[in-house]
């Protein structure tokens, strides 16, 4: 966990991936720092301080989800994104709002488990290598020293059998030491071995997903799992692949699942972040009799955000200190259309701005995972070096901005569509092109995109 970052450091880290939106970055940076500050307080005061939930307002594609996701990744906090429209009011078929907390705990368990596996990796690999040695040089089947009732009475051949067994054991030990040396030197990586692995059983309760009955299914499945033996199957793999499988199995045996569960529940409760997208879609008090009440969903979300106990397969989880980040475009509604109680639970309001042409230029070239860098890396695998002139990048940004203005504004996601269309022919012919270096010019961009971009009827289907 990395809760020690200062707000300024958090913003600087987010700047590496997200362009603009300073207000949103500052809000999440302060929220994260307050968690660190809270952890330093005396226990009686710490229990009184709950995180200040954030409401992000802005059109699609401006970075609402990415800000929250990168923030969680930065500190290693459990994070999930849910869509408010997927939930239904209690009493209707569909996902109940408590499932978001259960999903958060599952994410937390996965994170903690991965960390624990890393800690025992060396020991697990050592045990996996030992199993490989035993597979490559198996012990001979011991034959009974008694052939008939008379031998049983007088033990006629017992000593000779013991001598033979002792010689065989010495021979096997020598062979195993030799194999151990070869394994350590990497000389047997391509040898094929047959190993028994635990079979992943498909759950008969998968059909319950999305019906609001997942918890019942999971508990029933766990109860059955403790009685039913695990199935194993034989697989033929190279030593290299078998080592990975066996190391994973040994690591699972070495980690203490009770410790994993305890730490995971603690992290979910104290450090968890739940991002509720499209909250504007459940705002508004009008509801048709045919539709599931949107206000009812808000009222179901309210106790989770306020703080309550949610039953999960890992035990009861308190939601009092989970940070909730809600987001919505609020085109057809406004934050005040949410029920007053829910509004009060999101005291920090942040408005994200629409992206300009200059923002698009920065998005294309500045972030560590910039789109142009991605395409350059992809085509480099075919032996082609592509570069974009500054004028070409500006032209791409202008076209993306214009198409957003003329059709639906989908923010930075428009750049993905534009870039795919721009490099479509080049990507298709890359394996056959003999040129080692290609420069994308404004003329090339104009040729590939301008005609489509100017025709609104065509651009709304293609771009």
From Swiss-Prot:
Subunit note: A double ring-shaped homohexamer of HslV is capped on each side by a ring-shaped HslU homohexamer. The assembly of the HslU/HslV complex is dependent on binding of ATP.
Function, as annotated: ATPase subunit of a proteasome-like degradation complex; this subunit has chaperone activity. The binding of ATP and its subsequent hydrolysis by HslU are essential for unfolding of protein substrates subsequently hydrolyzed by HslV. HslU recognizes the N-terminal part of its protein substrates and unfolds these before they are guided to HslV for hydrolysis.
Keyword ATP-binding: yes
SMART domains: AAA, ClpB_D2-small
Entry's transmembrane regions: none
Gene3D superfamilies, sorted: 1.10.8.60, DNA helicase RuvA subunit, C-terminal domain, P-loop containing nucleotide triphosphate hydrolases
Gene Ontology CC entries for this record: HslUV protease complex
Binding locations of ATP: 19, 61-66, 277, 341, 413
Molecular function GO terms recorded: ATP binding; ATP hydrolysis activity; peptidase activity; proteasome-activating activity
Protein known as: ATP-dependent protease ATPase subunit HslU
GO terms of biological process kind: protein unfolding; proteolysis involved in protein catabolic process
Keywords carried by this UniProt record: ATP-binding, Chaperone, Cytoplasm, Nucleotide-binding, Stress response
Principal subcellular localization: cytoplasm
Family in the record: Belongs to the ClpX chaperone family. HslU subfamily.
Subcellular compartments: Cytoplasm
């Amino acid at each position: 966990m990395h809760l020690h970052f200062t707000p300024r450091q958090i913003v600087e880290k987010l700047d590496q991936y997200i362009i603009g939106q300073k207000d949103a970055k500052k809000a999440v940076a302060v929220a994260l720092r307050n968690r660190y500050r809270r952890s330093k307080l005396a226990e009686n005061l710490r229990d009184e301080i709950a995180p200040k939930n954030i409401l992000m307002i802005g059109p699609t594609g401006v970075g609402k989800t990415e800000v929250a996701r990168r923030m969680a990744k930065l500190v290693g906090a459990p994070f999930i994104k849910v869509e408010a429209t997927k939930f239904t009011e209690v009493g209707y078929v569909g996902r109940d709002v408590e499932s978001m907390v259960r999903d958060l705990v599952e994410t937390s368990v996965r994170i903690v488990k991965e960390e624990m596996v890393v800690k025992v990796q060396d020991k697990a690999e050592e045990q996996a290598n030992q199993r490989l040695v035993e597979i490559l040089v198996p012990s001979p089947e011991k034959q009974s020293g008694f052939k008939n009732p008379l031998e049983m009475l007088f033990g006629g051949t017992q000593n000779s059998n013991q001598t033979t067994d002792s010689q065989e054991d010495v021979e096997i030990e020598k062979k195993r030491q030799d194999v151990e040396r070869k394994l350590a030197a990497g000389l047997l990586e391509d040898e094929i071995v047959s190993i028994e692995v635990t079979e992943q059983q498909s759950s008969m309760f998968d059909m319950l997903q999305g019906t609001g009955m997942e918890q019942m299914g999971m508990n029933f499945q766990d109860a059955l799992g403790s009685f039913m033996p695990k199935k194993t199957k034989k697989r033929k793999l190279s030593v290299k692949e078998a080592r990975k499988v066996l190391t994973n199995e040994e690591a699972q045996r070495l980690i203490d699942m009770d410790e994993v569960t305890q730490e995971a529940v603690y992290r979910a409760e104290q450090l968890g972040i739940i991002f509720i997208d499209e909250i504007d879609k459940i705002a508004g008090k009008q509801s048709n009799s045919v539709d599931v009440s949107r206000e009812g969903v808000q009222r179901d979300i309210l106790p989770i955000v306020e703080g309550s106990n949610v039953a999960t397969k890992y035990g009861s989880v308190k939601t009092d200190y989970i940070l909730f980040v809600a987001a919505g475009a609020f085109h057809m509604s406004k934050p005040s259309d949410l029920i007053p109680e829910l509004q009060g639970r999101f005291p920090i309001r942040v408005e994200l701005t629409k992206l300009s042409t200059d923002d698009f230029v920065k998005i294309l070239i500045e972030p560590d995972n910039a789109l142009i860098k991605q395409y350059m890396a992809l085509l480099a695998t075919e032996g082609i070096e592509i570069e974009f002139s500054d004028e070409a990048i500006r032209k791409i940004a202008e076209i993306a901005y214009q198409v957003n203005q003329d059709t639906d504004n989908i923010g930075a996601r428009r750049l993905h569509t534009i870039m795919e269309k721009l490099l479509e022919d080049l990507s298709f012919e890359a394996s056959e092109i003999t040129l080692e270096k290609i420069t994308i010019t404004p003329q090339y961009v104009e040729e590939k995109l301008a005609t489509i971009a100017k025709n609104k009827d065509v651009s709304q289907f293609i771009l």
